[in-house]
């Protein structure tokens, strides 16, 4: 039976920046419109965290029962390592997704009821990433889904629930955050190219191959860097977003130098940290820019 620490590891807490950063970015965009509502931001954060934990457990369950996780590096796999039964991991996934759905329902009803449909699509996307008979994560569409759900959907959704409108500042943040979120998955799938290929999990990294996947990762980081300068058109204070550059460069180091396997594990951590620092810095800059 898995210990509490193993259940926590199975939730993959290092992926939580993917949940937190879009909400921070969207709230900063709402603050730019003089419309930040902090209790709505907290509700959005609850939705995002619950969904990310839910999708991580769902991936553990789905990959585990398929045998995809039998020869993995990285965080603990509860089902693949036979530390927990598939049913218990599935229950954890469904519980997390249900809590996210409940928080999302409350947020939508208090903001814009049509967002319920968006939430339903998000939950379906979380499950179908590796679940179902034809998971899109096994067909090379995982990166696109991460970009959409953790970029435009999460950032602009957060901005809209607070401001009831979106603008180009929110869109720029959405694209940058989506690119950074996508880069985390690209790094993960770069590490897993050998095992994914053996398991017939045809991720985008498997399709592109090692060299082009490394180029894609660096290109996604560059997108966020360019958009930092674009956001300076709103307020010069957005230059503070460049505080994340050293973290991004550190993350990119092992990718540029051709390292693989376990040597890429720190890349996921550093990329997620860079994304969170960037989102906090730019959101703070936008809020301060409206006060100054």
UniProtKB/Swiss-Prot annotation:
According to the UniProt entry, where is the signal peptide?
A: none
Q: Which reaction does it catalyse?
A: an all-trans-polyprenyl diphosphate + 1,4-dihydroxy-2-naphthoate + H(+) = a 2-demethylmenaquinol + CO2 + diphosphate
Q: Which UniProt keywords apply?
A: Cell membrane, Magnesium, Membrane, Menaquinone biosynthesis, Transferase, Transmembrane, Transmembrane helix
Q: How is the cofactor bound?
A: Can also use Fe(2+) or Zn(2+), with lower efficiency.
Domain of life here?
A: Bacteria
Q: Which residue windows are transmembrane per the record?
A: 35-55, 101-121, 137-157, 166-186, 220-240, 271-291
- GO cellular-component term (any): plasma membrane
- Specify where it is mainly localized: membrane
Membrane topology according to the record: Multi-pass membrane protein
This protein's cofactor list reads: Mg(2+)
- Entry's Gene Ontology BP terms: menaquinone biosynthetic process; vitamin K biosynthetic process
Do you know which CDD domains this protein is assigned to? PT_UbiA_UBIAD1 (cd13962)
Identify its protein family: Belongs to the MenA family. Type 1 subfamily.
Recorded hits in NCBIfam families, A to Z, give: menA, PRK06080.1-3
Briefly state the protein's biological role: Conversion of 1,4-dihydroxy-2-naphthoate (DHNA) to demethylmenaquinone (DMK). Can use a variety of allylic isoprenyl diphosphates as substrates but has a requirement for at least three isoprene units.
Name of the protein in question: 1,4-dihydroxy-2-naphthoate octaprenyltransferase
From what organism does this protein derive? Mycobacterium tuberculosis (strain ATCC 25618 / H37Rv)
């Amino acid at each position: 039976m898995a210990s509490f620490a193993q259940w926590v590891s199975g939730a993959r807490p290092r992926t939580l920046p993917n949940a937190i950063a879009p909400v921070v970015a969207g709230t900063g965009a709402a603050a730019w419109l003089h419309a930040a509502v902090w209790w709505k931001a907290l509700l959005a954060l609850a939705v995002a965290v619950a969904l990310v934990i839910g999708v991580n457990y769902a991936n553990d369950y789905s990959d585990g029962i398929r045998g995809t996780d039998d020869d993995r590096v990285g965080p603990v796999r509860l089902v693949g390592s036979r530390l927990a039964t598939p049913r218990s991991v599935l229950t954890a996934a469904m519980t997390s997704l249900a809590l996210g759905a409940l928080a999302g329902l409350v947020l939508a009803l208090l903001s814009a009821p049509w967002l319920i449909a968006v939430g339903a699509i998000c939950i379906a996307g979380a499950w179908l990433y590796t679940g179902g008979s034809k998971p899109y994560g096994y067909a090379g569409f995982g990166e696109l889904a991460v970009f959409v759900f953790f970029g435009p959907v999460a950032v602009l959704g957060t901005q809209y629930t607070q401001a009831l409108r979106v603008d180009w500042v929110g869109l720029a943040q959405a694209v940058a955050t989506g690119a950074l979120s996508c880069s985390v998955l690209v790094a993960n799938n770069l590490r897993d190219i050998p095992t994914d290929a053996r398991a017939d999990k045809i991720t985008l990294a498997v399709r592109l191959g090692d060299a082009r996947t490394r180029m894609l990762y660096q290109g996604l980081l560059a997108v966020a860097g360019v958009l930092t300068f674009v956001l300076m058109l709103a307020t010069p204070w957005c230059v503070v977003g460049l505080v994340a550059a050293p973290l991004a460069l550190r993350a990119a180091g092992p990718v540029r130098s051709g390292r693989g396997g376990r040597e890429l594990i720190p890349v996921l951590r550093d990329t997620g940290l860079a994304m969170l620092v960037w989102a906090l810095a730019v959101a703070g800059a936008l809020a301060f820019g409206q006060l100054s």
